[in-house]
Regions:
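Conserved PDZ fold ligand-binding element
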Residues: 86-87, 290-325
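Serine-dependent protease modules
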Residues: 31-275, 280-284, 302, 325-329, ...
Length: 363
């Protein structure tokens, strides 16, 4: 969110825009003379810009003399369907008492909160169009973030410093990044890009060269340059149905804690497998405890971390490899209370299969 005091004064804004217009007139080639890559950028922006939303959030608190505005800021979002659903970051709107959505063409709508997932930094709103037909809304197509390659072109559209529909371009710089201090549910999920992402871009779309949303821009590295991060759209697609139907995400508490096996340390720790999760603690009576999962009792300090050895090593869930707690989080997205999942563990050098029943939903 932007600091409302960090804004250009109107004369400076007008001057900056005028200078930009003059530069474009002098330097930009005619569309017919643009390179193929430039034409692609232009076309993607033209198609996507109308679906990008300027999010304005206000937090109002009661005082002894009446309500007072405690804070306000701006961010970005984007339409995902013609019903008017808009995705953005939770940190853009968290704690807000009033949210406005500025759509393409200058239309402003009140926003109705549909659902939030703070652990994943996701919020879903719906534009209150007052019964107007949604056929003129232009949602953005959601792509496939599991089929990305480092080096491919990406485009970010948002509202940095309140500048509506600003476009920046770059490449995909990294995959599966772990960001310290990020929401706990995201873990090693982030996409990294060198496309400029600034305050106000949060919640906006990261697009591929076909104009498909591959991520939601979320984080900028404060101590670096040209280092931004986005939440993969496939991660978001897994929780969308629950946000729409329930307003929140089912996150079952399994009742155990685990740490990944340190790279290259399996032999030193006397383990028979080289990847998986070392079960550290199991709560009595929990779903994991009932399933028969076991923790160890021998503690070894290593690299500022104390590992509990001698217990189960979780290697797979329903046949899919698990190498980090984040893998388990992703697997459980979209699951339902009562679902039975198979845990593959190594105990005493032997593989075993345990069956765990997911617990009821708690509100």
């Amino acid at each position: 969110m932007n600091n409302p005091n960090h804004r250009l004064s109107p004369p400076k804004v007008a001057g900056a825009f005028l200078a930009g217009i003059i530069m474009v007139a002098q330097m930009s080639p005619a569309y017919s003379q643009a390179t193929a890559d430039e034409r692609n950028t232009i076309e993607v922006f033209k198609r996507a810009a109308a679906g990008v939303v300027h999010v304005k959030a206000v937090r109002v608190v009661a005082t002894e003399v009446g309500d007072a505005v405690a804070g306000q800021g701006t961010g970005s979002g984007f339409l995902i369907d013609q019903a008017g659903h808009v995705l953005t970051n939770y940190h853009v709107v968290g704690g807000s008492s009033d949210v406005k959505l500025l759509l393409g063409g200058g239309r402003t709508f009140d926003a109705r909160l549909v659902g939030t997932a703070p652990a994943f930094d996701i919020a879903l709103f719906k534009a209150e169009t007052g019964g107007a037909a949604g056929t003129d809304l232009l949602p953005l197509p959601l792509g496939d973030s599991d089929k990305l390659e480092i080096g491919q072109k990406v485009l970010a559209i948002g509202n940095p410093l309140g500048l509506h529909n600003t476009l920046t371009t770059g490449v995909l710089s990294g995959l599966s990044r772990d960001i310290p201090g990020a929401p706990v549910g995201l873990g090693q999920a982030f996409l990294q890009t060198d496309a400029a992402i600034n305050p106000g871009n949060s919640g906006g779309p990261l697009l591929d060269s076909s104009g498909n949303v591959i991520g939601i821009n979320a984080v900028v590295a404060r101590d670096g340059q040209n280092i931004g991060f986005a939440i993969p759209i496939n991660f978001v697609k897994k929780i969308l149905p629950e946000l729409i139907s329930m307003g929140h995400v089912y996150q079952p508490a399994l009742g155990f804690s685990a740490l990944p096996i340190p790279p290259g340390m399996a032999t030193l720790l006397g383990l028979s497998v080289h990847s998986g999760l070392l079960v550290q603690e199991v709560a009595e009576g929990s779903p994991a405890g009932i399933a028969g999962l076991r923790a160890g009792g021998r503690m070894i300090p290593m690299n500022d971390t104390v590992y509990v050895l001698g217990g189960d090593v979780l290697t797979a869930v329903n046949g899919k490899s698990v190498t980090s707690p984040h893998d388990l989080t992703v697997f459980l997205l979209g699951s339902k209370p009562g679902d039975r999942i198979q845990l593959t563990v190594v105990r005493g050098g032997e593989r075993r299969t345990l069956v765990l029943t997911l617990p009821p939903m708690h509100f």
